[in-house]
């Protein structure tokens, strides 16, 4: 057994851990050990580096923990996929590369919780900007010199993108030129974490590439954190496994848990921090009975509403093996072409009811009919909308199964447990059909493939959701930030009741944000990094942002009405 000592030990080199490792080692006198259970982010592996290949990492276990849920009681008892990234970059190494920050009111809502007053949107915006380099340059809402490369959608990529945005506007919803700017609500182009050379912009590329040469940062891959060590109520180190070898590292200052919304509560529970009754079931000595560890688990569900495409403009030919070498060669040599995009270049956010305070439904538009993980491709030209609700009231949990760090925990999201879930999904399907009926899509829209035109009643729509809805891969909130009885960490990520221990990742969100989670997770880590370093928080940015204030969710007067038979 080997033993080393560092100022900070970070468990997990993902979207948050790499940010902390990079920012903390900007101070040359600070030493950091970064532990990652997966391997390197191999730059010659097209599966993780080519944006268009985003489905491939989810199909194996080299880069994916490939968790499964317990049977979900409201989803036909399906065991549902729960992919999480494994390797330098974490889930930013295998995600869909959609750069969505969330709605301003997400953060303003967080700030209404006791003790979280400094998490308003205007407090968070400087850290979004700090992390970002946007290809069209900085402005009041965007950064121009950060580690994360953000690419904007360019005109003429595929006519279906513009047609689907136009259809949303024709249906009476707003148009927005920037889903991360003044107004998230509406339809428009989608920003993506892709470099100017057409490569995935993971946090390993953006952050670790600048930090890994520093002598005060040690990165250890294939290192699975087993337990956090404690001296009384103070975290003092970590034991971890590299193959059959066990090692121990001691932390002079803090242990920083950045393992994600599944593995962070798992590591805490295995270390004796969590619901006391759960720990006693496995004979784990209780360091602190903290009931919220693993509770409050949230995610986004989504469906694929799919249509036949009457014109040969979809990505269907690119799915054929004989066309892929040319696509791959252009991407490899020039960083251009179909391989250089994740093809989520347009989308949007809407409110389905006028009394919704901010958008409750998200859209990703895709010019092909296929599942996110590459399965169930429709053998024809097609297109689809990924659509799902944003802030489900349903809550789940992550619970340890055993003391073995190699065993996956018991995961139950408890999807669709509340009546509001069902109402929002029915509303979403009907709103999507209304959008797809608009004149902008007349030349492209063929028959509805899924759910199918005959699926109309509430009962039929509910059956489709139970059988076909899937995760959007956004687990979060399982070690929530706050000060109520179920809160795990304070506003700086410090675990309540303990010293020298923080959690910094998507698990500390009190409520899931409106959209994809990679950008918010990076922001959270940037913000808390300043707290750890004892630096003054970046000044609030005083910019306006859209608030509906009871405005109509959809302008019916401007909508183009189309018969339902179209």
UniProtKB/Swiss-Prot annotation:
Role noted for this protein: Involved in the biosynthesis of the osmoprotectant glycine betaine. Catalyzes the oxidation of choline to betaine aldehyde and betaine aldehyde to glycine betaine at the same rate.
An annotated GO cellular component: membrane
InterPro entries assigned: BetA, FAD/NAD-bd_sf, GMC_OxRdtase, GMC_OxRdtase_N, GMC_OxRtase_C
Organism for this UniProt entry: Burkholderia lata (strain ATCC 17760 / DSM 23089 / LMG 22485 / NCIMB 9086 / R18194 / 383)
Lineage: Bacteria, Pseudomonadati, Pseudomonadota, Betaproteobacteria, Burkholderiales
Active-site feature positions: 474
Highest taxon in the source lineage: Bacteria
HAMAP family tied to this protein: Choline_dehydrogen
A GO molecular function held by the record: choline dehydrogenase activity
Pathway: Amine and polyamine biosynthesis; betaine biosynthesis via choline pathway; betaine aldehyde from choline (cytochrome c reductase route): step 1/1
Region (Disordered) residue spans: 180-202
Family that this chain belongs to: Belongs to the GMC oxidoreductase family.
Protein name, entry field: Oxygen-dependent choline dehydrogenase
Annotated GO biological process: glycine betaine biosynthetic process from choline
Swiss-Prot/TrEMBL keywords: FAD, Flavoprotein, NAD, Oxidoreductase
Catalysed reactions, semicolon-separated: choline + A = betaine aldehyde + AH2; betaine aldehyde + NAD(+) + H2O = glycine betaine + NADH + 2 H(+)
């Amino acid at each position: 057994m080997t033993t080393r000592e560092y100022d900070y030990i970070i468990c997990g080199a993902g979207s948050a851990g790499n940010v902390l490792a990079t920012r903390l080692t900007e101070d040359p006198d600070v030493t950091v050990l970064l532990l990652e259970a997966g391997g390197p982010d191999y730059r010659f592996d097209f599966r993780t580096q080519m944006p268009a290949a985003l489905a491939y990492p989810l199909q194996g276990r080299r880069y994916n923990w490939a968790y499964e849920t317990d049977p979900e009681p409201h989803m036909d008892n399906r065991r549902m996929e729960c992919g999480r990234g494994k390797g330098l970059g974490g889930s930013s190494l295998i995600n869909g590369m959609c750069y969505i920050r969330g709605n301003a009111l997400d953060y303003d809502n967080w700030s209404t919780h006791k003790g979280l007053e400094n998490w308003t949107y205007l407090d968070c915006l400087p850290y979004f900007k700090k992390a970002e380099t946007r290809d069209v340059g900085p402005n009041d809402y965007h950064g121009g010199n950060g580690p994360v490369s953000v690419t904007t959608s360019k005109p003429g990529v595929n006519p279906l993108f513009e047609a689907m945005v136009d259809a949303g506007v024709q249906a009476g919803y707003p148009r927005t030129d920037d889903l991360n700017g003044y107004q998230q609500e509406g339809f428009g182009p989608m920003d993506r974490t892709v470099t100017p050379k057409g490569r995935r912009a993971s946090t390993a590329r953006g952050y670790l590439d600048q930090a890994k040469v520093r002598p005060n940062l040690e990165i250890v891959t294939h290192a699975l954190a087993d337990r956090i060590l404690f001296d009384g109520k103070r975290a003092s180190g970590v034991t971890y496994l590299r193959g059959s070898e066990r090692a121990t590292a001691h932390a002079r200052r803090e242990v920083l848990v950045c393992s994600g919304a599944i593995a962070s509560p798992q590591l805490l529970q295995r270390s004796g921090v969590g619901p006391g009754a759960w720990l006693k079931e496995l004979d784990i000595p209780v360091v602190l009975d903290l009931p919220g560890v693993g509770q409050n688990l949230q995610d986004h569900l989504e469906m694929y509403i799919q249509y036949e495409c009457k014109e040969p403009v979809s990505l269907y030919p690119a799915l054929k093996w004989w066309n892929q070498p040319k696509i791959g060669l252009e991407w490899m040599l020039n960083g251009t072409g179909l391989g250089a995009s994740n093809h989520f270049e347009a989308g949007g956010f809407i409110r389905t009811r006028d009394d919704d305070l901010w958008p409750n439904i998200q859209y990703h538009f895709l010019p092909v009919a296929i599942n996110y993980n590459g399965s169930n491709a429709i053998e024809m030209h097609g297109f689809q909308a990924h659509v799902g609700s944003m802030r489900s009231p349903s809550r789940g949990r992550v619970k340890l199964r055993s003391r073995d760090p190699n065993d996956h925990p018991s995961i139950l999201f408890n999807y669709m447990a509340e009546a509001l879930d069902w109402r929002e999904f029915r509303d979403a399907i009907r709103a999507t059909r209304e959008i797809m009926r608009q004149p902008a899509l007349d030349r492209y829209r063929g028959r509805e493939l899924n759910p199918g035109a005959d699926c109309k009643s509430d009962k039929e729509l509910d059956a489709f959701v139970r059988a076909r809805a899937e995760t959007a891969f956004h687990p979060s909130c399982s070690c929530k930030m706050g000060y109520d009885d179920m809160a795990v960490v304070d506003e700086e990520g410090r675990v309540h009741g303990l010293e020298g221990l923080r959690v910094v990742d998507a698990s500390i969100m009190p409520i899931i944000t409106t959209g994809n989670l990679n950008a918010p997770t990076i922001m959270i880590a940037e913000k808390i990094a300043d707290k750890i370093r004892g630096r003054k928080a970046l000044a609030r940015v005083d910019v306006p942002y859209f608030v509906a204030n009871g405005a109509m969710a959809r302008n019916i007067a401007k909508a183009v009405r189309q018969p339902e038979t179209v």
